[in-house]
């Protein structure tokens, strides 16, 4: 906001362009929503909702990005996040349609979130999971195919419940 000359502190309330502030904040690839408004008491309120990455993609083709909880691509930053890293044969379509729901399912389960360090996608789109504990790799197979986004998420959740229940018994 300062760089664009619209920082509201020290500016008369009538000269503050709240719409422009909202538009500027919304342009950030890390902002999901931005709201800005003035009150009758002469205050300016700015509310920003951050996009939440669920998985980091480091594909063999050189792509490096995050996918958020709305299945949208986000650029990487200089900061690291404690997220699962997906490597291998990954294109953006597969990352947003299959790996993002898989990441959301894993991150929603406290044990899986702490157990799984990496997901590797093989050339036939089979999935391997690399746990934080031990020096082994777990092959879980291909994720279920579904055309509908909601059905796909439910199918991936059911698939992971079955696969990870077996693996969870091994670690308990």
Give short role names for the model-derived ranges:
Residues 3-27, 32-172:
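Charged, solvent-exposed interaction patches on well-folded alpha/beta domains
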């Amino acid at each position: 906001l300062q760089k664009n000359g619209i920082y509201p502190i020290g500016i008369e309330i009538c000269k503050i362009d709240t719409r422009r502030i909202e538009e500027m904040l919304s342009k950030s690839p890390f902002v999901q929503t931005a709201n800005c408004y003035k009150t009758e008491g002469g205050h300016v309120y700015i509310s920003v909702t951050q996009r939440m990455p669920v998985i980091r993609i480091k594909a063999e083709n050189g792509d490096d990005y995050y996918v958020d909880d709305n299945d949208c691509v986000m650029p990487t930053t200089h900061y690291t996040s404690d997220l699962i890293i997906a490597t291998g044969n990954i294109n953006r379509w597969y990352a947003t349609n299959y790996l993002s729901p898989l990441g959301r399912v894993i991150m929603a389960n406290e044990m899986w979130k702490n157990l799984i360090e990496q997901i590797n996608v093989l050339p036939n789109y089979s999935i391997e999971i690399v746990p934080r504990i031990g020096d082994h790799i777990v092959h879980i197979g291909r994720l279920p195919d579904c055309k509908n986004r909601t059905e796909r998420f439910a199918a991936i959740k059911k698939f992971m419940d079955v696969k990870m229940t077996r693996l969870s018994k091994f670690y308990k």
